[in-house]
Amino acid sequence: MSCYICGRGHHAQRLPFLCPIDARNRLYEGRLAQAHTLIDSDRLKQQTNALIEQPPPTAAKASRSSPAARKAAIDDWASKHQEAIDRTAEIIAQADRLKAEVEAARQEIRQRKKTLARRKSDLAEAADGIEEKRKKQLDKVKDNIAATRADWDLVHESTASNRAFLCMEAARLYGLRRLKKGSSVKYELGGAEVVDLHALTGASPQAITISFSHIVHILNRACQYLAIRLPAEIILPHADYPRPAILSITSSYSYNHDDIPYPGTSDQQSELNTLPQDDLFYQRLPRARPLFIDRPLPVLAKEDPAMYSLFIEGVALLAHDVAWACCSQGVPVGPEDVLHVGRNLYNLLIGNQLLRGVSSNDGGNSTPQMGRYSHGAVHSYLGSAEGSDLVRTFRLPNPIKLADRLKSKLSSDAPNPDWELLEDDAWT
């Protein structure tokens, strides 16, 4: 080993020691030789002591030749022999027990294998039977479902036919007719002519009010029969509400009719001022659109522009409701035909069913489209995914845009007076 002081490796002959480490390394050989000598001396000492402790051979022979020693040796051998026999017998018995246990275990294993094989065969047979039985039960359930669905479809078709029949009979009892004179076509309801929305400017207030009153009554009755809910809620006359009105689409079906203020012919704010202003409920009440007027439309537009706008909005909402009801019952209505309320109402309640009756007599599809979709049955429910897809195909114009279009049409058709009317005090 090298010295950690001088850093030189030790060599006994060539490099003398210069420090304690080198001296210690020089002494290692002597120490190792002394250790080997001590080990050899100890081994020789042990061998000598073992030889000294052994008895002489003559004494051993003498001890074995004495009778007592021979008897003791024989007894010792006999006891050892008996012990060996007993131990052998015990080992043989233990072996027999182990053989019996092994044989019993093998027998149990064979029995279990037989049982498992039998169970597997039984399970295979049962599985084949269960699969067949399950298939039969599944087919039976499918047949029952198909039969139930077919019965359900038949009941729904019958219900739709009854709905259509009730609507047609109600329209006929109410006097809904189509009158054709030359090239002009007019519609009559309740003995009064259904006003043309494009000619409201020239119609009298009584004719407009009566016509809209009849329309909302027959439309509400038809919606009850068809179990549909119109987008814009109609308020029929009731206590303290002598004339019909209509709500906007966003305000419909959210409030009780008794809580909604009556839209009088003057500004509605006078009635709203009588309500408790500290109650948030009354502040949020919707404003109903009137479906009646008490003066000619040009006069109303000049004297009460706010009431005129509300009335036009109500007319547009009513036309939108009629068109929506037609589309939901399979009666096509184009975007330009929404304002033809009389024609749409007649086609919904009478004309469309007459056309379907003719097509069924010619061998066409006899399933009535009217009455199929509704809000009152799970079958063909208008609130389902299928019904929502149907509603998205209507493509009806927005009531606000419809009101603007009607307002512009009426303003363009309004007659311009040739003379300016002056009050009496203007001559003084």
UniProtKB/Swiss-Prot annotation:
Write out the entry's keywords from A to Z: Autophagy, Coiled coil, Membrane, Protein transport, Transport, Vacuole
User: Could you give a single Gene Ontology term from the biological process aspect?
Assistant: protein transport
What drives induction of this protein's expression? Expression is hihghly increased in nitrogen starved hyphae, as well as in invasive hyphae.
- Gene Ontology molecular-function annotations: SNARE binding
Q: Supply the InterPro entries for this chain.
A: UV_resistance/autophagy_Atg14
Disulfide cross-links: none
Q: Which PANTHER family match?
A: AUTOPHAGY-RELATED PROTEIN 14, UV RADIATION RESISTANCE-ASSOCIATED GENE PROTEIN
Q: According to its record, what is known about the domains?
A: The coiled-Coil domain is essential for autophagy.
Q: Which family does it belong to?
A: Belongs to the ATG14 family.
Name of the protein this chain belongs to: Autophagy-related protein 14
Source organism: Pyricularia oryzae (strain 70-15 / ATCC MYA-4617 / FGSC 8958) (Rice blast fungus)
